[in-house]
Amino acid sequence: MSSSKNNPTGLNTENMRNIVRRSYQYIAMYNVINSFALDEYNPMSTGGWNKTYAMTALADHTVRAIARPNNDTLYVLTMLDLRGDPVVVHYPAFDSKFVSLETSAYDHYVDIPLSTTKGDFKKPMTMLYYTDRTQGYDGAPVEGVDKYMKMSGDFASAFLRIMPHAAEPERLKKNLATMKEVTAKTLSEYLGKPAKPVEKIRFPAFGRDADVFEKGGRYVMQFVFNHTTFDPNDEMDQAVLAALKPLGVEPGQYFNLANQPALGSPTIQWKAEIELDESDGKKFREIAEKIAQESLAIWNSPDNPYLFDVFKPKGKMTLEPMVVQSAVGPIGNPADQAMYPGIGTTDGKSMNALNDYVIRMSKDQLP
């Protein structure tokens, strides 16, 4: 995104901070979802849409693909493109004390449609994913489908967390084999028909949040707006639409990304009240980096007020915890599934990669 030249009022710091705060959830999740679907350098990438990736070993400190990776659960990721056809995913039964299915789209609202805490995963389950824009599907029931999940975005993630019981070798082996039984098919494929052709699409460049805010934020937000369902009665939805409208970003506006360089700016004639230039991009970056630092301080504080307010469904989130969860590390389980308390140092200083740190918990302190 970028101070205004042609608008007499311009963009002040307060306006820009509001734009960044309202946009953060979308840009963060755009980067996450597209990385897991499209980034060939992401070791956990599915290698495309409507495909799955199953981990084969528990995460450790070397894992960089996920912010705050759990080291006691394994992941099975499914990245969804719901534009041309619904996607049907088969989930097997697991021999595990904890399994949860988490879904989210570019808007970063989190749903847990299945979990062992709700009695799920005792038997196989087939789920159909779709959106209001999915072509050729009107919500009609499909034989063999157990559950239907309407997503808020055309591009989305659905992934499992599985406690594999690593201390029990046979149980671990069984769960690793079961993870490979998760399959994703378009509805046409599920019904034994050829897959429908899907319109090829060029995504605005994804990467680090600060880079996108500086060089491509407006293009990413326009893309996101075109592929997200907004609720006219939802305060946060309407606030982000209002914040971006002066920049010319509105749902349904077409633009051509054919000549966009990596994290650069294609030539687009924005119908904007405020014109942006390169200096604005740098300012957006500074604000985004400051918000990320503020959010990390909140997250790591023993007095973090948002432990029970993050990773919730639409309608149950407020802006402050949404910004914090998006800036610190997108995608997580709500408090009834997992907790994310911050861990600080004994001297109160920030952790430094030059040092080693030891975290000790007694057996009685473990959950």
Question: Where do the language-model regions lie?
Answer:
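A compositional/structural signature for long, glycine/proline-rich flexible linkers
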Residues: 2-367
